C-alpha cells in the first residue's frame, strides 16, 4: 500500500501528517537501538543472517568499489562489504537515526573495521552525495520506514553510477496462505511481548508488525523501482515471501 495523500502517510496502522512520521520513526529506533541486534536474532530465529548473506551474494560487489549501506543501522552489511571492497574500496554507512549510527560505529570499530568505512547521518529522500557516486546501494529493512518511498528511490537512482545496482531487502507478503496466518499471529501477539521483555518496548515492535503490513508487496515495489528509473528489476522471495530481495540497475 502506498501513501494515502500528499499531506498524510501511515505510521503503522495510524494515519499521520507526513512531517510527523520521521520524528515518530526516530523515536522507535532511539528506543530499540541498544537491543537491536539481540532482537533481530530473537524475532527472526537468526534467519536474518542468511537473508543478509544472500543480499551480499547478489550484490556483485568487488574489490575497489564504492558501496552505500543505507539505513545501515548496526552495520551487519557494512562489515561484510568492507572486507569485499578491500583497502582500495570504500563503504558508506548511512542512517537517519543517530542512535543507530552510533551503535554501528562502535560495533564495527570494536571488531577492527576502521580503514575503509565512513559514517554519515542522512535522509534517504535527500541523499547528500554527488550524482553517480556509488557502484552499489543496499537498504536493508529500512525502506518501509521512509515517509516518501518514491522520492527515496529517485534519490538512490541519482547517486548510483551507470552500471550500478540497488538492492532492497525488506519484509514483504508471504506467498503461502497458511504461513501468512501463522505469521500474523506471531507478529501481532508474540513479537510485541518479546519486545517488551527484552527491549522494554512492546509498542515499537507492534509498530514493526504494522509497518510490515503497510509496506508495498513484491510486485508493487518492483513497479515503484521501475518508475524511479531502475531497469532489469527482479526480486527473490525468501522464506516463502516473508522477506523479499529486490534488485534493479541503472544503465
From Swiss-Prot:
Secretion signal span: none
Cysteine disulfide partners in this protein: none
GO molecular function terms listed in the Swiss-Prot or TrEMBL record: 2-methoxy-6-polyprenyl-1,4-benzoquinol methyltransferase activity; demethylmenaquinone methyltransferase activity
Reactions catalysed, as given in the entry: a 2-demethylmenaquinol + S-adenosyl-L-methionine = a menaquinol + S-adenosyl-L-homocysteine + H(+); a 2-methoxy-6-(all-trans-polyprenyl)benzene-1,4-diol + S-adenosyl-L-methionine = a 5-methoxy-2-methyl-3-(all-trans-polyprenyl)benzene-1,4-diol + S-adenosyl-L-homocysteine + H(+)
Origin: domain of life: Bacteria
Gene3D superfamilies: Vaccinia Virus protein VP39 (3.40.50.150)
UniProt-listed Pfam families: Ubie_methyltran
Similarity annotation: Belongs to the class I-like SAM-binding methyltransferase superfamily. MenG/UbiE family.
Protein name (record): Ubiquinone/menaquinone biosynthesis C-methyltransferase UbiE
Organism listed in the record: Klebsiella pneumoniae subsp. pneumoniae (strain ATCC 700721 / MGH 78578)
Name of the gene: ubiE
